[in-house]
Amino acid sequence: MTVTSQVKPEDEMLNWGRLILDGVSYSDMVGARDRPKEITWFDYWMSLANEYEQEAERKVALGHDLSAGELLMSAALCAQYAQFLWFDERRQKGQARKVELYQKAAPLLSPPAERHELVVDGIPMPVYVRIPEGPGPHPAVIMLGGLESTKEESFQMENLVLDRGMATATFDGPGQGEMFEYKRIAGDYEKYTSAVVDLLTKLEAIRNDAIGVLGRSLGGNYALKSAACEPRLAACISWGGFSDLDYWDLETPLTKESWKYVSKVDTLEEARLHVHAALETRDVLSQIACPTYILHGVHDEVPLSFVDTVLELVPAEHLNLVVEKDGDHCCHNLGIRPRLEMADWLYDVLVAGKKVAPTMKGWPLNG
């Protein structure tokens, strides 16, 4: 028997902490919650994106480019969160609008985001690089999105890293954002991370010996595999990630539909088989040779067995494990503290060059 969720998508998957920490204003969230019944979730956010864009155009006319960039960034986030819950034409419409708005925002941001047009195996892969102020060369952090999150969503985390003297690079890989049209979710994401490393090592503003990777949610899975397979990476953060999808049965109905969508298959069983194979990392985790920070919330949908896997397979001398007893998925419910701690850890490793000692915080749970 097929069980269909009766919960609205915005109630099933919406995490207020995530959206607010990523830059969506509390007032906009309240507006979405309290919107008139005749206005859909999608239409509310797309209309709001238009309003932010219009205000940005007014700011440009007045010579206030910095404010315009912030407003366009807000517009892009509105388009992102309009579409990320759907698997029909709304997804494509919102995605295209988000890309358009972010392209407008990019040169107006502080620091600006420069778009580099890469091609990997014949597939176009735009990469945005932001360089911090001050003399270089600078360390850099490659940021990886998740199941429905894309490069534009990392803006606030980028800013924390940039403020600490590190450059950032963002892109969409297989099954994500701009690349989804060309390639479904696949088991070779590390190839695309390595292509970004190739790009960064050619930039005079970047320190070749201090490039790290940070991945959120599914991106945390990608970060672990990238660190295992790309020896040029000097640091790795898996932020609410996982090592495998053995826990498929624990996923929500909407998350399973999302896996099906990015797999470009017709049935949930086909999706399960595809992503289970594509996202397996346990065979390579022992190859990780750089400092690795893993953040996991006890109340995450990803089971605590992930922690056992990490402790068994990731070399102990490289591991910094943080388990938050009150944390949800990616610990979005804990405010900015976990993000600051990750940014500071990256600073210690990549900027200050500290030899971070292996640590375990919050584990074992009753320890």
UniProtKB/Swiss-Prot annotation:
The UniProt record lists the EC number as: 3.7.1.19
Effect of substituting residue 300 to A = 94% loss of activity
Q: Name one GO molecular function term.
A: hydrolase activity
What Pfam families does this protein map onto?
FrsA-like (PF06500)
Instruction: Give the pH-dependence text from the record.
Output: Optimum pH is 7.5.
Uppermost EC category: hydrolase
Q: In which pathway does it act?
A: Alkaloid degradation; nicotine degradation; 2,6-dihydroxypyridine and 4-(methylamino)butanoate from 6-hydroxypseudooxynicotine: step 2/2
Q: Determine if ATP-binding is one of this entry's keywords.
A: no
Which ranges of the sequence are coiled-coil?
none
Q: What is the effect of changing residue 149 to A?
A: 84% loss of activity
Its catalytic activity? 2,6-dihydroxypseudooxynicotine + H2O = 2,6-dihydroxypyridine + 4-(methylamino)butanoate + H(+)
Q: Which SUPFAM superfamilies match?
A: alpha/beta-Hydrolases
Active-site residues per Swiss-Prot or TrEMBL entry: 148, 217, 300, 329
The observed outcome of changing residue 216 to A is:
92% loss of activity
| UniProt keyword terms in alphabetical order | Alkaloid metabolism, Hydrolase, Plasmid
User: What GO terms in the biological process aspect are recorded for it?
Assistant: alkaloid metabolic process; nicotine catabolic process
Family statement drawn from the similarity comment of this UniProt entry: Belongs to the AB hydrolase superfamily.
Biological role: L-nicotine is used as a growth substrate. Plays a role in nicotine catabolism by cleaving a C-C bond in 2,6-dihydroxypseudooxynicotine.
Instruction: Summarize subunit and interaction data from the UniProt record for this chain.
Output: Homodimer.
Protein name as it appears in the record: 2,6-dihydropseudooxynicotine hydrolase
Could you tell me which species this protein originates from? Answer: Paenarthrobacter nicotinovorans (Arthrobacter nicotinovorans)
Taxonomy of origin reads: Bacteria, Bacillati, Actinomycetota, Actinomycetes, Micrococcales
